[in-house]
Protein backbone atom coordinates (compact mmCIF):
# COMPACT_ATOMS: atom_id res chain seq x y z
CA UNK A 1 0.00 0.00 0.00
CA UNK A 2 1.43 3.35 -1.04
CA UNK A 3 0.68 6.14 1.45
CA UNK A 4 0.27 9.60 -0.15
CA UNK A 5 2.63 12.24 1.22
CA UNK A 6 0.80 15.56 1.55
CA UNK A 7 2.74 18.54 0.21
CA UNK A 8 3.71 21.16 2.81
CA UNK A 9 2.66 24.02 0.51
CA UNK A 10 -0.65 22.52 -0.64
CA UNK A 11 -3.52 21.71 1.72
CA UNK A 12 -5.51 19.70 -0.85
CA UNK A 13 -6.28 16.07 0.05
CA UNK A 14 -6.51 13.03 -2.22
CA UNK A 15 -10.01 11.68 -2.84
CA UNK A 16 -11.17 10.03 0.42
CA UNK A 17 -13.22 7.54 -1.62
CA UNK A 18 -9.99 5.95 -2.86
CA UNK A 19 -8.61 5.78 0.68
CA UNK A 20 -11.79 4.11 1.91
CA UNK A 21 -11.70 1.55 -0.91
CA UNK A 22 -8.01 0.68 -0.87
CA UNK A 23 -6.19 2.07 2.18
CA UNK A 24 -8.46 1.36 5.16
CA UNK A 25 -9.37 5.04 5.19
CA UNK A 26 -5.79 6.37 5.35
CA UNK A 27 -5.88 9.45 3.12
CA UNK A 28 -2.26 10.53 3.59
CA UNK A 29 0.48 11.69 5.94
CA UNK A 30 1.91 15.14 6.51
CA UNK A 31 4.77 16.70 8.41
CA UNK A 32 2.57 19.49 9.73
CA UNK A 33 -0.72 20.09 11.50
CA UNK A 34 -1.33 23.62 10.25
CA UNK A 35 -4.66 25.31 10.90
CA UNK A 36 -5.30 25.64 7.17
CA UNK A 37 -4.75 21.93 6.62
CA UNK A 38 -7.03 21.04 9.53
CA UNK A 39 -9.85 23.22 8.20
CA UNK A 40 -9.45 21.80 4.69
CA UNK A 41 -9.47 18.28 6.12
CA UNK A 42 -12.68 18.66 8.10
CA UNK A 43 -14.51 20.17 5.15
CA UNK A 44 -13.63 17.05 3.15
CA UNK A 45 -14.56 14.50 5.81
CA UNK A 46 -10.93 13.89 6.82
CA UNK A 47 -9.39 14.17 10.29
CA UNK A 48 -5.96 13.62 11.89
CA UNK A 49 -5.86 10.45 13.96
CA UNK A 50 -2.36 10.11 15.37
CA UNK A 51 1.28 11.18 15.20
CA UNK A 52 4.05 8.66 14.58
CA UNK A 53 7.76 9.34 14.03
CA UNK A 54 7.05 12.97 13.24
CA UNK A 55 4.29 12.24 10.71
CA UNK A 56 0.60 13.07 11.11
CA UNK A 57 -1.77 10.41 9.76
CA UNK A 58 -5.02 11.62 8.16
CA UNK A 59 -8.07 9.39 7.86
CA UNK A 60 -11.59 9.25 6.47
CA UNK A 61 -14.16 6.90 7.98
CA UNK A 62 -17.19 5.59 6.15
CA UNK A 63 -20.00 4.94 6.60
CA UNK A 64 -19.88 7.99 8.87
CA UNK A 65 -21.59 8.18 12.27
CA UNK A 66 -23.50 11.44 12.60
CA UNK A 67 -26.17 12.96 14.80
CA UNK A 68 -28.94 15.11 13.37
CA UNK A 69 -29.66 17.50 16.28
CA UNK A 70 -33.45 17.31 16.08
CA UNK A 71 -33.21 13.52 16.37
CA UNK A 72 -31.05 13.57 19.49
CA UNK A 73 -32.01 10.81 21.93
CA UNK A 74 -31.35 11.31 25.63
CA UNK A 75 -31.39 8.01 27.58
CA UNK A 76 -33.90 7.92 30.44
CA UNK A 77 -31.26 7.54 33.14
CA UNK A 78 -29.36 10.56 31.83
CA UNK A 79 -32.55 12.61 31.52
CA UNK A 80 -33.20 11.96 35.21
CA UNK A 81 -29.70 13.20 36.06
CA UNK A 82 -30.22 16.28 33.90
CA UNK A 83 -33.43 17.16 35.71
CA UNK A 84 -31.55 17.05 39.00
CA UNK A 85 -29.89 20.31 38.00
CA UNK A 86 -26.91 20.38 40.37
CA UNK A 87 -24.52 20.83 37.44
CA UNK A 88 -23.62 23.86 35.30
CA UNK A 89 -22.74 23.67 31.60
CA UNK A 90 -20.79 26.33 29.72
CA UNK A 91 -19.16 26.75 26.33
CA UNK A 92 -15.60 27.95 25.75
CA UNK A 93 -14.94 28.63 29.42
CA UNK A 94 -11.69 26.64 29.64
CA UNK A 95 -10.82 25.21 26.23
CA UNK A 96 -7.16 24.38 26.90
CA UNK A 97 -8.06 22.61 30.14
CA UNK A 98 -10.69 20.49 28.40
CA UNK A 99 -8.24 19.41 25.68
CA UNK A 100 -5.60 18.59 28.30
CA UNK A 101 -8.08 16.44 30.24
CA UNK A 102 -9.10 14.65 27.03
CA UNK A 103 -5.43 13.92 26.34
CA UNK A 104 -4.95 12.51 29.84
CA UNK A 105 -8.11 10.37 29.88
CA UNK A 106 -7.61 6.60 29.91
CA UNK A 107 -9.11 4.89 26.84
CA UNK A 108 -10.04 1.18 26.70
CA UNK A 109 -7.76 -0.86 24.43
CA UNK A 110 -5.49 2.13 23.76
CA UNK A 111 -1.86 2.55 24.72
CA UNK A 112 -1.51 6.23 25.51
CA UNK A 113 -3.28 9.09 23.76
CA UNK A 114 -3.42 10.36 20.19
CA UNK A 115 -3.79 13.92 21.54
CA UNK A 116 -0.06 14.65 21.63
CA UNK A 117 1.18 18.14 22.56
CA UNK A 118 1.30 19.00 18.84
CA UNK A 119 -2.43 18.27 18.58
CA UNK A 120 -3.20 20.37 21.64
CA UNK A 121 -1.29 23.32 20.18
CA UNK A 122 -3.05 22.98 16.83
CA UNK A 123 -6.54 22.89 18.30
CA UNK A 124 -5.77 25.79 20.61
CA UNK A 125 -4.87 27.75 17.46
CA UNK A 126 -8.22 26.80 15.91
CA UNK A 127 -9.91 27.91 19.12
CA UNK A 128 -8.19 31.29 18.94
CA UNK A 129 -9.38 31.56 15.32
CA UNK A 130 -12.97 30.87 16.41
CA UNK A 131 -13.32 27.37 14.93
CA UNK A 132 -12.67 25.01 17.86
CA UNK A 133 -14.97 25.02 20.88
CA UNK A 134 -15.25 23.26 24.22
CA UNK A 135 -18.31 22.41 26.29
CA UNK A 136 -17.77 21.99 30.01
CA UNK A 137 -19.82 20.42 32.78
CA UNK A 138 -19.14 21.78 36.27
CA UNK A 139 -20.22 20.30 39.60
CA UNK A 140 -19.88 21.71 43.13
CA UNK A 141 -17.28 19.99 45.30
CA UNK A 142 -17.61 19.18 49.02
CA UNK A 143 -16.89 22.83 49.82
CA UNK A 144 -19.52 24.10 47.44
CA UNK A 145 -16.98 25.41 44.92
CA UNK A 146 -17.84 24.67 41.29
CA UNK A 147 -15.22 22.56 39.52
CA UNK A 148 -14.77 21.12 36.04
CA UNK A 149 -16.15 17.58 36.01
CA UNK A 150 -16.19 16.68 32.32
CA UNK A 151 -16.73 17.89 28.81
CA UNK A 152 -15.70 17.65 25.18
CA UNK A 153 -14.33 19.70 22.32
CA UNK A 154 -14.68 19.86 18.57
CA UNK A 155 -14.53 22.02 15.47
CA UNK A 156 -17.36 24.04 13.94
CA UNK A 157 -17.36 25.04 10.28
CA UNK A 158 -20.55 26.53 8.92
CA UNK A 159 -23.47 24.45 10.14
CA UNK A 160 -21.45 21.33 10.96
CA UNK A 161 -19.92 20.51 14.33
CA UNK A 162 -17.11 17.94 14.21
CA UNK A 163 -16.76 16.21 17.57
CA UNK A 164 -13.25 15.29 18.64
CA UNK A 165 -12.84 13.96 22.19
CA UNK A 166 -14.56 13.69 25.58
CA UNK A 167 -13.50 13.21 29.18
CA UNK A 168 -15.24 12.74 32.52
CA UNK A 169 -13.85 13.15 36.02
CA UNK A 170 -17.29 12.44 37.46
CA UNK A 171 -19.87 9.92 36.19
CA UNK A 172 -22.04 11.24 33.33
CA UNK A 173 -20.31 14.64 33.25
CA UNK A 174 -19.32 14.43 29.57
CA UNK A 175 -22.76 13.05 28.68
CA UNK A 176 -24.42 15.98 30.44
CA UNK A 177 -22.24 18.43 28.50
CA UNK A 178 -23.12 16.72 25.22
CA UNK A 179 -26.86 16.48 25.92
CA UNK A 180 -26.95 20.20 26.68
CA UNK A 181 -24.67 21.19 23.81
CA UNK A 182 -26.65 19.58 20.98
CA UNK A 183 -29.88 21.62 21.41
CA UNK A 184 -27.76 24.73 22.01
CA UNK A 185 -25.89 24.17 18.74
CA UNK A 186 -29.15 23.45 16.93
CA UNK A 187 -30.57 26.78 18.10
CA UNK A 188 -27.56 28.49 16.50
CA UNK A 189 -28.13 26.67 13.22
CA UNK A 190 -25.96 23.54 13.41
CA UNK A 191 -27.62 20.85 11.29
CA UNK A 192 -25.14 17.99 11.53
CA UNK A 193 -22.78 16.64 14.19
CA UNK A 194 -19.93 14.44 12.99
CA UNK A 195 -19.19 11.65 15.48
CA UNK A 196 -16.40 10.19 13.29
CA UNK A 197 -16.55 6.69 14.80
CA UNK A 198 -19.58 4.43 15.12
CA UNK A 199 -19.56 3.80 18.88
CA UNK A 200 -22.09 2.43 21.32
CA UNK A 201 -21.72 5.65 23.31
CA UNK A 202 -22.92 7.80 20.39
CA UNK A 203 -25.58 5.29 19.34
CA UNK A 204 -27.22 5.86 22.73
CA UNK A 205 -27.62 9.50 21.69
CA UNK A 206 -29.23 8.54 18.39
CA UNK A 207 -26.29 8.53 16.00
CA UNK A 208 -26.92 7.12 12.55
CA UNK A 209 -24.68 5.99 9.70
CA UNK A 210 -24.36 7.88 6.42
CA UNK A 211 -22.60 6.47 3.36
CA UNK A 212 -19.45 8.54 2.95
CA UNK A 213 -20.60 10.00 -0.38
CA UNK A 214 -23.80 11.27 1.27
CA UNK A 215 -21.82 12.62 4.22
CA UNK A 216 -19.42 14.46 1.90
CA UNK A 217 -22.34 16.00 0.02
CA UNK A 218 -23.89 17.23 3.28
CA UNK A 219 -20.57 18.83 4.17
CA UNK A 220 -20.40 20.61 0.81
CA UNK A 221 -23.84 22.08 1.42
CA UNK A 222 -23.55 22.94 5.12
CA UNK A 223 -19.96 24.10 5.57
CA UNK A 224 -20.60 27.17 3.43
CA UNK A 225 -23.67 28.32 5.40
CA UNK A 226 -22.90 30.55 8.40
CA UNK A 227 -24.50 30.08 11.81
CA UNK A 228 -27.35 32.34 12.86
CA UNK A 229 -25.19 33.51 15.75
CA UNK A 230 -21.61 32.91 16.90
CA UNK A 231 -21.09 30.25 19.57
CA UNK A 232 -19.19 32.64 21.82
CA UNK A 233 -18.49 32.06 25.49
CA UNK A 234 -21.52 31.64 27.75
CA UNK A 235 -23.65 29.45 29.98
CA UNK A 236 -25.54 26.65 28.23
CA UNK A 237 -29.01 25.69 29.47
CA UNK A 238 -30.37 22.18 29.06
CA UNK A 239 -33.83 22.31 27.57
CA UNK A 240 -36.56 19.99 26.41
CA UNK A 241 -35.93 17.41 29.15
Swiss-Prot record:
List UniProt keywords, sorted A-Z: Acyltransferase, Cytoplasm, Transferase
What Pfam families does the entry give?
Answer: Leu_Phe_trans (PF03588)
List the catalytic activities from the record. N-terminal L-lysyl-[protein] + L-leucyl-tRNA(Leu) = N-terminal L-leucyl-L-lysyl-[protein] + tRNA(Leu) + H(+); N-terminal L-arginyl-[protein] + L-leucyl-tRNA(Leu) = N-terminal L-leucyl-L-arginyl-[protein] + tRNA(Leu) + H(+); L-phenylalanyl-tRNA(Phe) + an N-terminal L-alpha-aminoacyl-[protein] = an N-terminal L-phenylalanyl-L-alpha-aminoacyl-[protein] + tRNA(Phe)
EC nos: 2.3.2.6
Q: Please give the biological process terms from Gene Ontology that the record holds.
A: protein catabolic process
| GO CC field | cytoplasm
Q: Which GO terms describe its molecular function?
A: leucyl-tRNA--protein transferase activity
Q: Where in the cell is it found?
A: Cytoplasm
Q: Which coarse location class applies to the principal site listed for this UniProt protein?
A: cytoplasm
Q: What does this protein do?
A: Functions in the N-end rule pathway of protein degradation where it conjugates Leu, Phe and, less efficiently, Met from aminoacyl-tRNAs to the N-termini of proteins containing an N-terminal arginine or lysine.
Q: Which family does it belong to?
A: Belongs to the L/F-transferase family.
Entry protein name: Leucyl/phenylalanyl-tRNA--protein transferase
Which species is this record about?
Neisseria meningitidis serogroup A / serotype 4A (strain DSM 15465 / Z2491)
Amino acid sequence: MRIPLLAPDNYAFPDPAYALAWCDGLVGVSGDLDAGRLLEAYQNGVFPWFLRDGWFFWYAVGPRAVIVPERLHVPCSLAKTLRNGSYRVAVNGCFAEVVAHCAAAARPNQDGTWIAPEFQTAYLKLHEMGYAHSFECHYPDENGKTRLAGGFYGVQIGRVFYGESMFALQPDASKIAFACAVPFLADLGVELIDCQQDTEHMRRFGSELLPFADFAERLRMLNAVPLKEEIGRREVACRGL
